[in-house]
């Protein structure tokens, strides 16, 4: 082939963080087939879809089997019934949305990477440590990335203090992946004020909003003025166990002017919509009964987090998260590096976590554990770590 490839791909790591983790775990498992490995690494759920969701999927599947109720291509922006259900969900925690501003997606990850299609070569600001998709999708597009560091001193919740007034795309995730830290209303207000003053746009990832239990905002739109400077991305992956079912949404307020019609045009060209069966399942998950069941699952994962947090506290290991988040972000003991600690846990306890270095330079020396395992696996992992650490 004589065509020139996108040279920006040379700016990203050859493989994705979780692929690297999986490769090391696979190699260890092949070399030690007698060892039982407990996985507290990648944030995939383990509980099944809830009864309300399954009933809706069965009903929608039956509709697809009947010529009178069969549906083909879904609307690019989502069926009205689900857009309205999302708006009702936001209303349940005091945020008013126009259903017409809601765009149904196959999960937050895709739209977080694709939304930057709307922008020219503009500067991008990301927190560090950071979910790798924010960085890689912009490096692929050739953009310049600026980092604002999260650390123990600021509780891994960096603020715009000291930043220049350059307009930027600004990524914020709360509750944060990987650190589990949650912005207060005052903290988010500082970012909204900064974005309004500088003409920036916040790309707000609220994928873990259902885990919030301390009264912190569950949406950027709980902050006055955010509709003028923010797009919000959310997902049912962790709220309703949809990691393998795939459904979420992106909120693009009409107040953002040309951004919304541009996103409509982009989606009409590059997206064929989320399947009808999945959207009916999502509608059911967001119903009163569906959310009750979802919150029972979230309580299960939070109990797992409590078990892990109890161990870390017992060992005197500093950490964030685990209360309003499924993630626990801990300081590697003994001054160990992230991958060094990963190898120690895998080889000596057969417990898998995620090295903080994979989330950015500021993540070196830290480690992420997740609460998405089964109760039995979490208890066993805690027992093993109790003996090791």
Go through each PLM region and give its residues.
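Hydrophobic residues in well-ordered beta-strands that form the structural core
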Residues: 126, 147, 204, 353-355
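Conserved core segment of the aminotransferase class I/II
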Residues: 225-299, 306, 310, 389
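PLP-dependent enzyme catalytic core of the Aspartate aminotransferase-like
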Residues: 88, 96, 335, 344-353, ...
């Amino acid at each position: 082939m004589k065509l020139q490839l996108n040279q920006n791909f040379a700016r990203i790591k050859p493989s994705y963080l979780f692929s690297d983790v999986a490769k090391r775990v696979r190699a260890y498992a092949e070399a030690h087939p007698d060892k039982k490995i407990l996985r507290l690494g990648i944030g995939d759920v383990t509980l099944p879809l809830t009864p309300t969701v399954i009933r809706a999927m069965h009903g929608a599947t039956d509709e697809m089997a009947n010529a009178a109720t069969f549906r083909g291509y879904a609307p690019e922006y989502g069926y009205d019934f689900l857009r309205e259900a999302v708006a009702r969900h936001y209303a349940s925690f005091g945020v008013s949305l126009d259903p017409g501003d809601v765009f149904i997606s196959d999960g937050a990850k895709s739209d977080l990477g694709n939304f930057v299609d709307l922008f020219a070569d503009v500067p991008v600001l990301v927190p560090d440590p950071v979910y790798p998709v924010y960085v890689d999708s912009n490096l692929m597009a050739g953009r310049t990335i600026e980092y604002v560091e999260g650390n123990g001193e600021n509780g891994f919740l960096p603020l715009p203090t000291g930043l220049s007034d350059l307009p930027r795309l600004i990524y914020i995730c709360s509750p944060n992946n990987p650190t589990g830290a949650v912005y207060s209303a005052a903290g988010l207000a500082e970012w909204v004020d900064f974005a309004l003053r500088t003409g920036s746009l916040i790309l707000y990832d609220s994928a873990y909003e259902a885990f919030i239990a301390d009264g912190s905002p569950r949406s950027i739109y709980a902050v006055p003025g955010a509709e003028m400077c923010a797009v919000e991305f959310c997902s049912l992956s962790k709220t309703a166990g949809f990691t393998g079912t795939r459904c979420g949404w992106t909120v693009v307020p009409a107040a953002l002017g040309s951004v919304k019609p541009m996103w409509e045009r982009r989606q009409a060209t590059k997206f064929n919509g989320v399947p009808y069966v999945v959207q009916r399942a999502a509608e059911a998950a967001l119903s009163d009964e569906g959310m009750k069941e979802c919150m029972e699952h979230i309580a299960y994962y939070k109990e797992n987090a409590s078990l892990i947090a109890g161990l870390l506290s017992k060992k005197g290991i500093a950490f964030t998260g685990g209360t309003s988040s499924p993630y626990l972000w801990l300081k590697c003991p003994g001054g160990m590096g992230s991958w060094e600690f990963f190898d120690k846990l895998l080889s000596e306890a057969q417990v898998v976590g995620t090295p903080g270095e994979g989330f950015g330079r500021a993540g070196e020396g830290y480690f992420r554990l997740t609460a998405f395992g089964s109760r039995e696996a979490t208890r066993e992992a805690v027992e093993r770590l109790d003996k090791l650490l």
